[in-house]
């Protein structure tokens, strides 16, 4: 089995960054230190990660500048694609991140405020460089504004938008983004498994690749995410604290007939 776009499924460690250190909490709260960012990134590169995600978990809410120096240092030592997000507000922000060594840039809060920003970014740098990060949480069903039952949030999940998360993912794809980073704020950090229903809904709404994020806690969680429609699986604490390795996840997927690199 290949991903929805016919490619091998990617395994992506996510490095949530606070003040230059890798941290992981539950729902972006109660953050605890998980290690030096560049050191971890190099270890994941050697271990066989297909890509790395750097997410500044404070940038959007505190207005801090994006972590250019961290990206530069990491890009000098690792040779797999780097996706960077957090605090990206303008086309110029994307430009400096790509010049610093990022391969893809993830956008969330700024795009909610000005959706046409996605088209501007994709038009200037190419769809393959722009990822729409959708931090979605469950809301009561029956709402006319959020018919899918999931709402897009901003500022690390602290602010609701009233925008339907599935519809927002589809709009982002229409505006030219090359990928959707779909993060369940309900599942994030809980290790209870990915939100499979949300994955299926977004997979049915878009043709671009979808990265499943939020909830990975056991080896049994990854194969269902792929069968639900994920083209890539992203996890943080299970990798940082050595509860699982990249190799174990790839072996489990390969045993289930899923193509991995």
Swiss-Prot record:
Q: What is its EC number?
A: 4.3.2.10
Q: Spell out the subcellular localization from the entry.
A: Cytoplasm
What the entry lists under Gene3D superfamilies is as follows: Aldolase class I
Cellular component annotations (GO), alphabetically ordered: cytoplasm
Keyword RNA-binding tagged: no
Keyword terms:
Amino-acid biosynthesis, Cytoplasm, Histidine biosynthesis, Lyase
> Coiled-coil annotation: which residues?
none
A Pfam family hit: His_biosynth
Q: Can you provide one Gene Ontology molecular function annotated for this UniProt record?
A: imidazoleglycerol-phosphate synthase activity
Q: Where is the active site?
A: 16, 135
Pathway-wise, it operates in: Amino-acid biosynthesis; L-histidine biosynthesis; L-histidine from 5-phospho-alpha-D-ribose 1-diphosphate: step 5/9
Known function: IGPS catalyzes the conversion of PRFAR and glutamine to IGP, AICAR and glutamate. The HisF subunit catalyzes the cyclization activity that produces IGP and AICAR from PRFAR using the ammonia provided by the HisH subunit.
Subunit structure and binding partners? Heterodimer of HisH and HisF.
Protein's UniProt name: Imidazole glycerol phosphate synthase subunit HisF
Gene that specifies this protein: hisF
